[in-house]
Amino acid sequence: MGLFDFSVKELHDKLVKKEISPFDLVSESFNRIESVEDKVGSFITLNKEAAFGVAEELGDAGIDPNNMLSGLPIGIKDNIVTKNLRTTAASKILENFDPIYDATVVSKLKNAQTINIGKLNMDEFAMGSSTETSYFHKTHNPWDLSRVPGGSSGGSASAVAAGEVLFSLGSDTGGSIRQPAAFCGVVGMKPTYGRVSRFGLIAFASSLDQIGPITKNVEDNAYLLEAISGLDANDSTSINQPVERFSNSLTGDIKGLRIGVPKEYLGEGVDPGVKQAVLDALKTLEKLGATWDEVSLPHSEYGVASYYILASSEASSNLSRFDGVRYGYRSPNATTLEELYTKTRSEGFGDEVKRRIMLGTYALSSGYYDAYYKKAQQARTLIKQDFVNVFENYDVIIGPSSPTTAFKIDGMINDPITMYSNDILTVPINLAGVPAISVPCGFSDGLPVGLQIIGNYFEESLLYKVAHAFEQETTFHKEKPNL
């Protein structure tokens, strides 16, 4: 049994009792990376020397018994800036970017005394659902190396599933934590918009982006979200909501819980194996005293179209800062200022990023603004209202995290529309801004299936309670890939 088979709480107890040291945990991480990284490709940049340095310092100082995360190894998605540690967003344009400050979540993790093992691979600028658009390399799913780990936080999910780190941070703009968590058989939480500071997150779509934790089990996830949540003066969209002790909600008692199951989430296009795993999960929840009814989120069908207009429009604006002037890649082939802009961006951005910038610029252009951007915002309002309506009568909404299990590498990369449609069950949650968690709920043809539990605003504690109760009745989260 490896050290990462233990939970956060178990490892914390061992550290406090000095049965193990932070150095042991960091060694475990890098030994595992040495063993499997060539197969999975979870990381872009490793932080080996600094990680061992922090581990030695913590070992000498002793573990704070009141600090649950002290001395534990974490991986961080490479669109979250880390001072003096290369942060690339998996793009050529930021290939050598060395940030001069830490993101707020990174500062919080340092205060919690976690140890950063390295920066994790992702789709370029978080634009993708497979981690295939990374400038550096493709990441492979630990359950089947011929398949994708999901995206855009594919490295964050694969590193946890492969046992390279104990837990990780990802970001979720349209499903980028929940879908890879589902594909890799781990737990991923997209918090309520504003629950976690975005300061230091390289922006894709500012009204949709949210940082969240990826872990092996629900309890670990709750501890990590506790550490990174809270109001931040550097992020005007962060919300002044008390930081809850999410871990206190894991009581196992869900008697009387009212579940809404959207008919749109189990209809055409959902793989039979995925649908069956979700229905089996609902039976498990019924045994625990919950009840469920079929409900409707009637405007879900407009989710993908609205999302790709709005997210691309915001990306068009956010990515205009990458111009070769202040930081990042600068084309050596430019002779005029105009050439500097055009060549830097055409050489520095990958195909998918350029596709979305062009789509967003088109949607924002004067002749098409009303027809596309404004219409998408109106659809977003209707999608949000759908959730409000259901939550008047139900405590949580449940469905699959993805309509399929992990697909083959190169299977969809040349078919953007099919790839985009894979987000159909996750983007409405970002458009509405509500929280959702993906937990392992079974397998289909040997590949993990994720159960998506969606809550009302700031009801992460309830999501953790439901997810934990389900997890305690099953063993799916204990299954490990054979690497």
Curated annotation (Swiss-Prot):
BP terms from Gene Ontology: translation
Catalytic activity from the UniProt record: L-glutamyl-tRNA(Gln) + L-glutamine + ATP + H2O = L-glutaminyl-tRNA(Gln) + L-glutamate + ADP + phosphate + H(+)
Family annotation (InterPro entries): Amidase, Amidase_CS, Amidase_dom, AS_sf, GatA
Pfam families: Amidase
Recorded GO MF terms: ATP binding; glutaminyl-tRNA synthase (glutamine-hydrolyzing) activity
Enzyme kind, highest EC tier: ligase
Domain of life of the organism encoding this protein: Bacteria
Functional description taken from the UniProt entry: Allows the formation of correctly charged Gln-tRNA(Gln) through the transamidation of misacylated Glu-tRNA(Gln) in organisms which lack glutaminyl-tRNA synthetase. The reaction takes place in the presence of glutamine and ATP through an activated gamma-phospho-Glu-tRNA(Gln).
Family named by the database record: Belongs to the amidase family. GatA subfamily.
Subunit record text: Heterotrimer of A, B and C subunits.
HAMAP family attached to this UniProt entry: GatA
Protein name as it appears in the record: Glutamyl-tRNA(Gln) amidotransferase subunit A
Organism, as annotated: Listeria monocytogenes serotype 4b (strain CLIP80459)
The organism's taxonomic lineage, starting at the top: Bacteria, Bacillati, Bacillota, Bacilli, Bacillales
